[in-house]
């Protein structure tokens, strides 16, 4: 894992990664924390980074427990606080709790977001991703 992190760091530095990414991170948790930060997501979306081959290296490390779904096929999510869909992932997402739901799509992922009651869903997607938004009651999707 350390070698993979070093490779990602080298590539990210060439693209102008923020100084929060030091290349000394040692665990999947360290990388997830940086990736899920607002600056991390912004950097990855802006630079279409990392590529799918690199994302796939993290799939065996159980990143789904962090709300990151890489080539996960078709799935249904209920009230996720955060869901990051990557690659060949197609999700139907139901948001009904009175809280903020953050949904991020990268590398061609697809989502149908259904928000109702007083839910607030924030959706960010890269070019090439597909999002269908449905709201009812007082819910909003931004």
Name each model-derived stretch.
Residues 1-142:
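Short, glycine-biased loop/turn motifs at secondary-structure junctions and
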């Amino acid at each position: 894992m350390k070698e993979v992190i070093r490779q990602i760091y080298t590539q990210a530095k060439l693209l102008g990664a923020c100084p929060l990414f030091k290349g000394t991170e040692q665990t999947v948790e360290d990388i997830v924390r940086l990736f899920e930060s607002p600056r991390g997501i912004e950097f990855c979306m802006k630079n279409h980074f990392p590529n799918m081959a690199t994302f796939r290296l993290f799939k065996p490390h159980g990143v789904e427990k962090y709300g990151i779904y890489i080539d996960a096929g078709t799935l249904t999510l209920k009230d996720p606080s955060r869901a990051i869909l990557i690659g060949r992932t197609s999700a139907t997402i139901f948001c009904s709790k009175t809280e903020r739901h953050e949904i991020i799509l990268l590398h061609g992922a697809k989502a149908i977001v259904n928000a109702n009651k007083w839910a607030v869903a924030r959706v960010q997607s890269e070019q090439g991703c597909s999002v269908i938004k449905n709201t009812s009651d007082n819910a909003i999707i931004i």
